[in-house]
Amino acid sequence: MQDCILCGAAQEVNPFSVGSFDGLSAFSNRETEPQKASRPFDKSRDGLVPSGGGASLVLESYESAVKRGAPILAEIIGYGFSSNGDHISVPNIDGPKRSLEMAIRNAGIALDEIKYINAHATSTPIGDLNEAKAIAEVFEGHRPYVTSTKSMTGHEMWMAGASEVIYSTLMMQNNFIAPNLNFEASAQLNIPAQRVNMEFDTFLSNSFGFGGTNSTLIIKKVK
């Protein structure tokens, strides 16, 4: 087992890289208001907005980080993974739910310790709905803040999982939760449409992929 690895991804936006998504009719048709097209969880969402970039993280054992004097930004305390979908581009409810439950069991923490969830929600009608149902079922009786940073960045495709861990870690370090932009209609989840200023030390991040591959990370601030 490696003590230290560099992990992450990069995504270039061009007709070839996003063609498969277009073939699945996954894109938003809101061309007259592109700034409002990415609207995860909102009732009027109609598809995702593609974007790209690059994100890298150093993942290593605590002993390795201390030995080389690295600033430790956060610790992964829980991980869940499941493979279950109803369609190549549509996750069902059971798969994401099992991924969430597995990560929480692995972390060994109570539900109310998780103050923020960075959802996978890409602004698609069925995908967002099923993820919301999975979160609501797992966190029944608890109301952590839930947002999707894709409302601000669009869907960064293959790099989204890595970048969203970075975004969430920056929020945790700087004591705020970024808003879920373009969210207008009410929902069962606790989704803030405005920035929330608050301290929190544990967050959960979902990344769900084609074919029903579902992963969940729980990350804690190192004090």
Residue ranges: model-predicted function:
Residues T32-A107, Y116:
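Condensing-enzyme catalytic core mediating Claisen C-C bond formation in acyl metabolism
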Residues P71-E75, I109-E113, Y145, A178-L181:
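Flexible, glycine/charged-enriched surface loops at secondary-structure junctions
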Residues G85-P96, S123-F139, E156-S163, Q194:
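Short glycine/threonine-rich loop-to-helix capping motif typified by GTGT followed
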Residues E101, K115, A136, T147, ...:
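Generic hydrophobic alpha-helical scaffold/packing signal
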